């Protein structure tokens, strides 16, 4: 159905009262509903920090770095957008204050402002506006832009001023602002309090933005009287005051906000062409989420487990692997340091059905990851290694099977006598401190050729060539490949098309049912409705192992 007008519509999502309210999930759910109504939707996140991208940020502070097909290192919310929309996004989906200022300062140095005094308004806001409006192509009906931070933060002001200007320039009928606010419950008095939301909306109006809808985040159902009060005090239609209580699964959120009528209100208010929501695919997903036939325990052995967001795409990919097998995947968070010794590994991993070794950087925790791999190999526990996980599998094989006791990676010991994992040639200067760390890894989508008869070729449905997203500086040292295959029995089952870079390793089926690893980050391409084959294969192996006991 063609749009009634050629103007691409803009929906802006802001947050108030507190951070971590789930703006990204709410925006993603709205995007999924609009797509299910036949609209072409793209999404974008505006991040108010001064880093150019999150690539050099501590995972404990920021969570995971989500890499897009074109190699951009972006915010984890971009992962939510891709999973809910089932659409690949690119680097333009994440705009940071650092990117904006870098561009404006570079233009000033080139003399592009012709003597102007460069200021936040109009130069910074114009650059933000350009990055928002360039998403509005002829192939897009709706752009949903999430404004990071909380209304009232100093850092968010240029972005919010830009939202006001966009609304003025493209027309009020073409812009819709959704404000997400916390509705706290005060236990002793037994009341839901509306005052924080009123103050948050007042702060937004002070900047010149009147929200068109308010989403109330709370831990319980919201009475109609509370909605009416917020509608009156915040000057929003009662139909546009939407309650979004905590859900059992994040994949329930689209149904929640659809039941509250947000998507219907948006399409009518913006005069968008629409059809009824097609729930076919999503209902099948929810059936798999809530009515599993199996349950398995999956150990995620990592070094950043105090902040689960550091492994967000991995955990979602593991759960999606469960959906593919009608299984519920319970994540057991295991600190890698607890697996340093065989006894420690046995305590942590003795009761699990499968293990995932995710990526990471630096020496801390690596000994434990190697210990976990040894335990899985010796006890036939299905294991999937990702990026650093692959490198640790190669190190473990060299040390314990090939007789190279001091085998290591140059990342952990630059002077190691046996660098079975080494720095990629083009990364040597950067590792030596002679280049920028940010945005310089092997990033983005790269192809691989899979060996005939291998487990990975089988799980990829027999495909000879596959593509995955990458983020690494180190690779398996080709000088040790023949020795490791001969002495350790490990199979290098996938390489770059020229055969020079190891992309997949595994053990033969008669040695281990499923000990597989990839240098890539396949979790970044997993979707709840289209689980990634490597994760589906891992869960399948775990279910088979558990049911055969």
Swiss-Prot record:
Entry keywords, A to Z: ATP-binding, Glutamine amidotransferase, Ligase, Magnesium, Metal-binding, Nucleotide-binding, Pyrimidine biosynthesis
Positions of the Glutamine amidotransferase type-1 domain: 301-548
Region named Amidoligase domain: 1-272
Residues the entry annotates as binding UTP: 19, 193-198, 229
UniProt cross-references to Pfam families, sorted A to Z: CTP_synth_N, GATase
Gene Ontology cellular-component annotations: cytosol
EC number: 6.3.4.2
PROSITE patterns referenced in this protein's UniProt entry, alphabetically: GATASE_TYPE_1
Pathway assignment: Pyrimidine metabolism; CTP biosynthesis via de novo pathway; CTP from UDP: step 2/2
Binding positions (CTP): 19, 153-155, 193-198, 229
Substrates-to-products reaction catalysed: UTP + L-glutamine + ATP + H2O = CTP + L-glutamate + ADP + phosphate + 2 H(+); L-glutamine + H2O = L-glutamate + NH4(+); UTP + NH4(+) + ATP = CTP + ADP + phosphate + 2 H(+)
Alphabetized PANTHER family for the sequence: CTP SYNTHASE, CTP SYNTHASE-RELATED
Function: Catalyzes the ATP-dependent amination of UTP to CTP with either L-glutamine or ammonia as the source of nitrogen. Regulates intracellular CTP levels through interactions with the four ribonucleotide triphosphates.
Assembly with partners or alone: Homotetramer.
Family affiliation: Belongs to the CTP synthase family.
Annotated protein name in UniProt: CTP synthase
Species annotation: Streptomyces coelicolor (strain ATCC BAA-471 / A3(2) / M145)
């Amino acid at each position: 159905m063609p749009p009634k007008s050629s103007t691409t519509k803009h929906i802006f999502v802001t947050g108030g009262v507190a951070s971590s309210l789930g703006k990204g999930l709410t925006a993603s759910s709205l995007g999924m509903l609009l797509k299910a109504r036949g609209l072409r939707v793209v999404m974008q996140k505006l991040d108010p920090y001064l880093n150019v991208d999150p690539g050099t940020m501590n995972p404990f502070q920021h969570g995971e770095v989500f890499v897009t097909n074109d190699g951009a290192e972006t915010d984890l919310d971009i992962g939510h957008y891709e999973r809910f929309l089932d659409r690949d996004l690119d680097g333009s989906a994440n705009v940071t204050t650092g990117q904006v200022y870098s561009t404006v300062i570079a233009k000033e140095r080139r003399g592009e402002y012709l003597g102007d005094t460069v200021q936040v308004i109009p130069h910074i806001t114009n650059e933000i506006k350009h990055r928002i409006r360039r998403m509005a192509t002829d192939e897009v009906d709706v752009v949903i832009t999430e404004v990071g931070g909380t209304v009232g933060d100093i850092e968010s002001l240029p972005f919010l001023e830009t939202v006001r200007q966009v609304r003025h320039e493209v027309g009020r009928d073409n812009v819709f602002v959704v404000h997400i606010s916390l509705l706290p419950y005060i236990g002793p008095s037994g009341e839901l309090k509306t005052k924080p939301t009123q103050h948050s909306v007042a702060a937004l109006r002070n900047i010149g933005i009147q929200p068109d809808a308010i989403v109330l985040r709370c831990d319980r159902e919201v009475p109609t009287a509370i909605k009416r009060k917020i509608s009156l005090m915040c000057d929003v239609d009662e139909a546009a005051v939407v309650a979004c209580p905590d859900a059992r699964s994040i994949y329930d959120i689209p149904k929640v906000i659809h039941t509250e009528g947000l998507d219907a209100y948006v399409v009518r208010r913006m005069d968008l062409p629409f059809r009824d929501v097609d729930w076919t695919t999503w209902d099948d997903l929810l059936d798999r989420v809530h009515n599993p036939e199996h349950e398995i325990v999956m150990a995620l052995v990592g070094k950043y487990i105090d902040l689960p967001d550091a492994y967000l795409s991995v955990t979602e990919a593991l759960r999606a692997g469960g959906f593919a097998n009608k299984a519920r995947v319970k994540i057991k968070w295991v600190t890698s340091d607890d697996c340093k010794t065989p006894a420690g590994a046995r305590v942590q991993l003795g009761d699990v059905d499968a293990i995932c070794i995710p990526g990471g950087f630096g020496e801390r925790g690596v000994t434990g990851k190697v210990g976990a791999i040894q335990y899985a190999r010796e006890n036939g526990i299905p294991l999937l290694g990702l990026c650093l996980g692959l490198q640790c599998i190669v190190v473990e094989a060299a040390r314990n099977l090939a007789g190279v006791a001091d085998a290591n990676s140059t990342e952990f010991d630059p002077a190691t006598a046996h660098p079975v994992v080494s720095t990629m040639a083009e990364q040597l200067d950067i590792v030596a401190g002679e280049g920028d760390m940010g945005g310089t890894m092997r990033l983005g989508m790269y192809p691989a050729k899979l060996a005939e008869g291998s487990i990975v070729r089988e799980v990829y449905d027999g495909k000879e060539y596959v593509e995955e997203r990458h983020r690494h500086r180190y690779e398996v040292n080709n000088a040790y490949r023949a020795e490791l295959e001969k002495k350790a029995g490990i199979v290098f089952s996938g390489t770059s098309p020229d055969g020079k870079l190891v992309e997949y390793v595994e053990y033969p089926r008669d040695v281990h049912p499923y000990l597989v690893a990839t240098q890539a980050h396949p979790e970044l391409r997993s979707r709840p409705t289209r689980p990634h084959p490597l994760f589906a294969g891992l869960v399948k192996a775990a279910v088979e192992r558990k049911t055969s006991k």
